[in-house]
Amino acid sequence: MARYRCCRSRSRCRRRRRSCRRRRRCRRRRARRSCRRRYSLRCCRRY
């Protein structure tokens, strides 16, 4: 399964992987929504 991490933008995720590692994980859809609401971050797939 692909692991998800929360990042501010997808472009940053693809370019800088380190920025994603420190962010929280978001596997399920609930986690993805919580990232957007609480931290106002978007989830990116690869890190």
From Swiss-Prot:
<dbReference type="GO" id="GO:0000786">
    <property type="term" value="C:nucleosome"/>
</dbReference>
<keyword id="KW-0221">Differentiation</keyword>
<comment type="function">
    <text>Protamines substitute for histones in the chromatin of sperm during the haploid phase of spermatogenesis. They compact sperm DNA into a highly condensed, stable and inactive complex.</text>
</comment>
<dbReference type="GO" id="GO:0003677">
    <property type="term" value="F:DNA binding"/>
</dbReference>
<dbReference type="GO" id="GO:0007283">
    <property type="term" value="P:spermatogenesis"/>
</dbReference>
<keyword id="KW-0238">DNA-binding</keyword>
<comment type="similarity">
    <text>Belongs to the protamine P1 family.</text>
</comment>
<keyword id="KW-0217">Developmental protein</keyword>
<dbReference type="GO" id="GO:0030154">
    <property type="term" value="P:cell differentiation"/>
</dbReference>
<keyword id="KW-0158">Chromosome</keyword>
<dbReference type="GO" id="GO:0030261">
    <property type="term" value="P:chromosome condensation"/>
</dbReference>
<keyword id="KW-0544">Nucleosome core</keyword>
<keyword id="KW-0226">DNA condensation</keyword>
<protein>
    <recommendedName>
        <fullName>Sperm protamine P1</fullName>
    </recommendedName>
</protein>
<dbReference type="GO" id="GO:0005634">
    <property type="term" value="C:nucleus"/>
</dbReference>
<keyword id="KW-0539">Nucleus</keyword>
<keyword id="KW-0744">Spermatogenesis</keyword>
